[in-house]
Amino acid sequence: MLEQVLIGNVILDCIDPKSLSDFYIRMLNWEKTYEDEGVILLASASCSVKIGFQRNLDYIPPVWPELPGMQQMQVHMDFKVRDKAHMESMVEHAIACGAVKAKEQYSELWTVMIDPAGHPFCFDTL
């Protein structure tokens, strides 16, 4: 029988790992735990999964919502919030940090945001 394997890191490609990691540090209050040329990892004491940022000079931001023939998002992160009031507070904070609220929203249970490199992410109450 195989030993269980856990997710350790979620890595986002981007052109500038430093600026994108700085955005997530401000927004989430996480700490930088690793940095070398082209890769930065962030961690939180309350979360076992780290978020990483990897330099990819050929990175093309996804279009959201998806459009035929355009770069599609391949994965996105959902950040858990306590309730609707906490979600609204985090949306305002994310905007102040440099995110944009997506024009298309499909539920009151989550809010879709776009980070400075174009990656969609959500705050959700699920």
Regions found by a protein language model. Name each.
Residues 41:
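Acidic (E/D-rich), amphipathic helical modules within compact regulatory domains
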Residues 103:
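Conserved S-adenosyl-L-methionine
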Residues 1-8, 12-34, 44-100, 114-126:
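Glyoxalase I/VOC metalloenzyme domain signal
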Residues 106-108:
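Short, small/polar residue-rich loop motifs at catalytic or cofactor-binding pockets
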